[in-house]
Amino acid sequence: MLSPPHSGTLEKLFQYIDLHQDEFVQTLKEWVAIESDSVQPMPRLRQELFRMMALAADKLRNLGARVDSVDLGSQQMPDGQSLPTPPIILAELGNDPKKPSVCFYGHLDVQPAQKEDGWLTDPYTLTEVDGKLYGRGATDNKGPVLAWINAVSTFRALQQDLPVNVKFILEGMEEAGSVALEELVKREKDNFFSGVDYIVISDNLWLSQKKPALTCGTRGNCYFTVEVKCRDQDFHSGTFGGILNEPMADLVALLGSLVDSSGHILVPGIYDQMAPITEEEKTMYENIDLDLEEYQKSSRVERFLFDTKEELLTHLWRYPSLSIHGIEGAFDEPGTKTVIPGRVLGKFSIRLVPHMTPSVVETQVTQHLEAVFSKRNSFNKMAVSMVLGLQPWTANINGTQYLAARRAIQTVFGVDPDMIQDGSTIPIAKIFQDITQKSVMMLPLGAVDDGEHSQNEKINRWNYIQGSKLFAAFFLELSKLHSGQQVPSGAF
């Protein structure tokens, strides 16, 4: 294990964070109390979002940061109403050319939550039970944002020189698709981002409950709809059953042609683009700390498709997967309605892995469904549409900031982190990497059972406080490595 850097400084920083942890938890409580729901297009909730962004801006100003709240205008909703879009916060603290500049991305909006959804506590009242801090946004993403701020404020409180220049980009519309964020990043490429060396995102989770992780890749996502239509009106099955091609039967056949019972995608050529899995990756998966029995139990699944850790992780991270999500237009209420839908719309998505591109996948899927539909000789009309196409993201794990993060994790947690990938899609990582051409890293703080987006979302007090220490140690390590000091042989 590597010896901790600046041990005297670290000891003071860690001691301060421990002594002030109740204060840090109280601030998180104040932030969680704001119902900053960006998903439901309601004027009251937009006001809450603006209040949340203003509170964060004030917090950063109190740190001494120069803060710019970028006005994004308004958002036209499908029903015709116009709602104001909360500003994106761009903040800067320090501009010493001798120091590395690191930009932290976070979001302050949350998914909808109501106690009647199955919460054991009020989702907007941070409640501590057995060291777990329950509340909407506690782990996604208000807790990690505050952990970063806690680290910066600790240096300031102790009058310690902050070893890095810090920038913040905080948004309030991530859960609603990051409205206008990509355009802002493009616009600020040669301004706000010009002096940035590294970008850090802390918006995902560890793979376990206790062992920290670094995320080095995410899958992409292509979301499709397939419509089968006979007419706009539904049919009575007693009057029309047996004398026409039923749209639902066509759609079920189409959806059933996409994937088999073992999870293998049946679209011809879909695996051809996939990057080969290297021996280095296989070794990495072997070294990851994952208790399959615990993982299965916490998932409340009777059995997974794969029996080994390596197979499960490979199929979760490095193989594409296809999921069927739902059908519009079908009768799905209690009772026995004998209707034949006149039009149905199926929804499914494919998670992409390195070297796969949305445009090629779109062509392959469309050609496959057209071929299947043609063989049915149906008189109905079929239309396939790709409504979302997001590429996978891969990081350079041998870059400076991954080395710094690994060393910081070793210092704070006393273990080497799991190097994990994320089977989901986090578009902002790819957006930052492609537009700014800067080094992007995902450094999660939350445990696997934090329940982001779910009922009873939480962050452990331990994760929140140790995460604040982690970011403080990361600043020191990044400064040390960026200045050109040698990394010991075998450090990564």
Swiss-Prot record:
Keyword Phosphoprotein: yes
Family the UniProt entry places it in: Belongs to the peptidase M20A family.
Known catalytic reactions: Preferential hydrolysis of the beta-Ala-|-His dipeptide (carnosine), and also anserine, Xaa-|-His dipeptides and other dipeptides including homocarnosine; carnosine + H2O = beta-alanine + L-histidine; anserine + H2O = N(pros)-methyl-L-histidine + beta-alanine; L-alanyl-L-histidine + H2O = L-histidine + L-alanine
Originating gene: Cndp1
Main location group: secreted
Tissue localization of expression: Detected exclusively in kidney.
One annotated Gene Ontology cellular component of this protein: cytosol
Cofactor: Zn(2+)
Amino-acid positions noted as binding Zn(2+) 2 in the UniProt annotation, renumbered to this chain: 107, 140, 203
Active site: 109, 174 (proton acceptor)
Function field: Catalyzes the peptide bond hydrolysis in Xaa-His dipeptides, displaying the highest activity toward carnosine (beta-alanyl-L-histidine) and anserine (beta-alanyl-3-methyl-histidine).
Keyword Hydrolase: yes
SUPFAM superfamilies reported in the protein's UniProt record: Zn-dependent exopeptidases
Pfam family, one: M20_dimer
Subunit structure: Homodimer.
Entry superkingdom: Eukaryota
Record-level GO BP terms: proteolysis; regulation of protein metabolic process
Details of cofactor binding: Binds 2 Zn(2+) ions per subunit.
Name of protein: Beta-Ala-His dipeptidase
Keywords, ordered alphabetically: Carboxypeptidase, Hydrolase, Metal-binding, Metalloprotease, Phosphoprotein, Protease, Secreted, Zinc
Source organism of the structure: Rattus norvegicus
Record's subcellular location: Secreted
